[in-house]
Regions:
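Gly/Ser-rich helix-loop-strand patches that form or flank binding pockets
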Residues: 1, 108, 112-156
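Small/aliphatic-rich secondary-structure junction motif
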Residues: 2-62, 88-89
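Short, solvent-exposed amphipathic alpha-helices that sit
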Residues: 22, 71-83, 109
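A structural micro-motif
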Residues: 32, 95-97, 150
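General small-molecule cofactor/ligand-binding pocket signal
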Residues: 37, 98-102, 153
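A short acidic, glycine-rich active-site loop
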Residues: 56-75
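Structural beta-alpha unit
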Residues: 81-122
C-alpha cells in the first residue's frame, strides 16, 4: 500500500533545490509529507573486468569514511536549514518533512527506498551536481525513471 509521502532525492545541487520547491508545493496540495533522501557512497576501489562487470573493494580507511560522513551530515544540515528558511519566508509551504541518509549507489537506494516505503511520487532534478551539459538528463534520474514502479517527476 502506498504511503502519503513525496520522496525527493537530493544531492545538494541547484537542481535539488528546484525539485524541493516543486515537491513541497506538490505535497501541500496532496496533503502529503516530504521525505528528503540523500544517498552517499564511501569511496571504493573499482576494478573493471571483461564484459563490463565491475568489482568493488571497500576502502578500510576509517578516517576517510568518518570525514565523508561528517561532510554528508554537514551538507544535509545546510540543506535542512535552507528548507527551514524558505518555509519561514513563505517561499516553501509549511509541510512536514524528514531527512533520510543512506549509503550506496544513488539510483539503487532511491529505487530500494521507493519499493520499501511506496511514496505517492518521486520528484527529482533532471540532473545532479556532477552533470555534463551535453546530457539532457542525468544518469541517476534516467535510471530511476526507467525502473521505478512509483510515478517519477523530473524537474529541469
Amino acid at each position: 500500500k502506498e504511503s502519503n509521502k513525496v520522496l525527493i532525492p537530493v544531492d545538494f545541487s541547484n537542481y535539488s533545490m528546484k525539485a524541493c520547491e516543486f515537491g513541497f508545493n506538490f505535497a501541500q496540495n496532496m496533503g502529503a509529507e516530504v521525505v528528503l533522501l540523500h544517498v552517499y557512497f564511501t569511496p571504493i576501489y573499482t576494478t573493471s573486468l571483461p564484459y563490463g562487470d565491475v568489482f568493488n573493494y571497500q576502502l578500510t580507511d576509517d578516517e576517510n569514511v568518518k570525514n565523508i560522513l561528517q561532510k554528508v551530515h554537514a551538507d544535509l544540515n545546510t540543506l535542512s536549514d535552507k528548507v527551514k528558511a524558505k518555509v519561514a519566508s513563505g517561499e516553501f509551504p509549511n509541510v512536514k518533512y524528514s531527512c533520510v541518509l543512506r549509503e550506496g549507489i544513488p539510483e539503487e537506494e532511491i529505487l530500494r527506498y521507493s519499493k520499501e516505503y511506496r511514496p505517492r511520487i518521486v520528484i527529482m532534478g533532471t540532473r545532479g551536481k556532477n552533470q555534463k551539459d551535453i546530457d539532457l538528463i542525468g544518469s541517476v534520474t534516467a535510471e530511476v525513471i526507467e525502473r521505478s514502479r512509483v510515478p517519477v517527476l523530473a524537474i529541469p
